[in-house]
Regions:
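Acidic/polar-rich alpha-helix caps and helix-coil junctions
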Residues: 1-289
Length: 289
């Protein structure tokens, strides 16, 4: 369980409900609340909140006004979970999760709890159900590769070959965004971002494409390889909520779980087998090994 948990960084990188990074969103909500995104508030009965969160409960500002993929992929404190025996859109029929210590989805006595305060929804079938009588599971084929991944790879490759993004770059990114219920890249950045010109440059689109890959392919095992080919994986702090906390005041404290300090440049390429190197002395070993 603990090796497959979303961390706080992933929760932050999903877009706002306007389809841009929450740090860039110039709308009223995120302009006001981004600096205090780790604080908690009472969930208001407005917009689509009733489908995503438990109205009247307390959760972090970070969990409000986010894009549909945030709610589809992540389970979090006071968030709803469609399925698991609940197949109605009515708020009264939706399951919602309590992650604080001594609560049903939090740490009680065993080690079966989330260290970060988040769980994956994507890898769980909505037909799986948990009742007082036991657990009923539904298996399904895990996606090895899917059309959205192909669109994103094509857009990325095309962007890297051009001085400025072409219409095709936007077209294939927008196909993925449309399925997620978001406006196109140029429209979203023009209307909602503090940096409306970002999609117009190669560097800006590179950043956007990489964010789209994270948001669309979250929990599918792609990030491991993406970070390595982009040379973006370096030692960093892994953070989550303070899951030992029993109250909202205690729980919503950003906590460093551990520091990944052993990763170095040589880890971008794994070592070749000795037998492979011995077959051809001119081949040599990968750097650092």
């Amino acid at each position: 369980l603990h090796d497959a948990l979303p961390i706080l960084t992933v929760a932050e990188q999903f877009y706002s409900s306007n389809g841009v990074p929450i740090s860039e969103d110039k709308g009223d909500f995120w302009s006001k609340n981004y600096p205090n995104r780790y604080d908690f508030t009472i969930i208001p009965d407005e917009g689509n909140n009733k489908h995503y969160l438990k109205i009247g409960e307390e959760t972090a500002y970070l969990h409000l006004n986010r894009e549909p993929r945030f709610y589809a992929n992540l389970s979090f404190d006071r968030g709803t979970w469609y399925g698991y025996g609940y197949a109605s859109d009515e708020p009264k029929d939706l399951a919602f999760y309590k992650f604080r210590a001594k609560e049903v989805s939090g740490r009680i006595t065993s080690e079966d709890y989330s260290y970060t305060g988040y769980l994956n929804k994507k890898v769980c079938s909505y037909k799986t159900s948990v009742t007082d009588n036991g657990l009923s599971t539904e298996r399904y084929a895990f996606p090895i590769i899917r059309l959205a991944d192909l669109y994103l790879m094509y857009a990325e490759a095309l962007n890297e070959t051009l001085n400025t993004p072409s219409n095709d770059v936007y077209t294939y990114i927008d196909l993925v965004r449309e399925r997620a219920g978001l406006d196109g890249v140029k429209e979203s950045w023009q209307k909602y971002s503090k940096y409306p010109e970002k999609p117009n440059t190669k560097t800006g689109m590179r950043e956007i494409i990489r964010m789209e890959r994270l948001n669309e392919l979250a929990c599918e095992g792609k990030r491991f390889w993406d970070l390595r080919r982009w040379k973006k994986e370096l030692p960093r702090e892994v953070k989550g909520w303070y899951v030992q906390g029993e109250t909202a005041q205690e729980f919503y404290r950003v906590t460093t779980l551990y520091l990944r300090s052993r990763y170095s440049f040589k880890d971008y390429l794994w070592p070749l087998k000795v037998e492979t190197v011995l077959k051809d002395p001119n081949l040599g070993q990968n750097p650092g090994w």
